[in-house]
């Protein structure tokens, strides 16, 4: 057992901690075998291996524990326009050693600073393009939805992120920001005009459509997907070879988080008609390298 303040011990792999929390899961499943068990563990160093132990626990029985996958900084670096620390390839569950898709990835949570707040405070710029501009920043949040929610597996959305909520987590009732105000009441979107702001409602609509596509198309149930990120031009390829070629069985997701226009090659795996799932237009691809 670790002593108070011994972070080295706490952050190391601890088999007693693994077994205690396995016991909690066993107890819950004894009452409801179909229930989900989700841990907010956020392990690092050796304790990250504990997450693998839990994710794969009783996996042959169709169980296993889900783990929160905090990618707040990685995603916020993208939305702010900074390539450093913007890689989120590790959100592929097998990178963490998980047998099944038990990683609950998220960009925002109750413990993290609001992405839009940081976009507007610290966003990058190039010429007339400025991430600190509200309309511009909200457009970038749409792209965030595309590269977060389409990744196969469960995801978490923190309240009002879908409206580009931009009050700091440390917002005080006197309109200042202070660490001591973290749990203070925050402005409610419906009372400050968010729901009638067309730019914010547009983020909501785009995210809703992406999530709807995720829920209603079996291609996203696959384990066969790749994530390539870290240069502000992330690409996700999703393939479900169990589906018919007449079904939606291949998806390519690309985004541009730089501050300038980019010529990004989608690298379609084959030629023919491809469909834009957002605007429902058709693109005839004749060159897989273009």
Predicted regions and their residues:
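Active-site-proximal helices and loops of the catalytic beta/alpha 8
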Residues: 2-112, 120-132, 136-138, 143-155, ...
């Amino acid at each position: 057992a670790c002593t108070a303040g011994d972070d080295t011990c706490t952050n190391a792999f601890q088999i007693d901690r693994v077994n205690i929390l396995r016991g909690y899961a066993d107890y819950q499943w004894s009452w409801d075998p179909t229930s989900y068990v989700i841990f907010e563990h956020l392990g690092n160093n050796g304790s990250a291996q504990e997450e693998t132990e839990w994710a794969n626990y009783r996996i042959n029985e169709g169980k296993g524990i889900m783990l929160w996958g905090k990618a707040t900084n990685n995603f916020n670096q993208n939305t702010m326009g900074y390539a450093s620390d913007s890689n989120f390839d590790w959100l592929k569950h097998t990178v963490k050693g998980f047998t099944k898709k038990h990683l609950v990835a998220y960009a925002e949570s109750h413990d993290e600073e609001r992405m839009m707040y940081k976009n507007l405070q610290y966003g990058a710029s190039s010429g007339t393009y400025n991430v600190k501009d509200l309309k511009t920043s909200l457009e970038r949040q749409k792209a965030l939805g595309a590269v977060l929610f389409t990744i196969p597996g469960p995801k978490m959305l923190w309240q009002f992120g879908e409206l580009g909520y931009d009050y700091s987590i440390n917002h005080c009732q006197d309109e200042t920001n202070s660490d001591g105000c973290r749990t203070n009441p925050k402005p409610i979107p419906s009372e400050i005009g968010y729901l009638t702001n067309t730019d914010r409602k547009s983020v909501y609509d785009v995210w809703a459509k992406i999530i709807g596509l995720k829920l209603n198309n079996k291609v996203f149930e696959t384990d066969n997907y790749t994530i390539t990120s870290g240069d502000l031009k992330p690409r996700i390829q999703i393939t479900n070879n169990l589906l018919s070629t007449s079904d939606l069985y291949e998806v390519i997701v690309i985004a541009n988080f730089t501050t300038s226009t980019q010529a990004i090659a989608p690298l379609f795996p084959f030629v023919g008609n491809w469909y834009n799932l957002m605007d429902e237009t058709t693109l005839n691809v004749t060159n897989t390298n273009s």
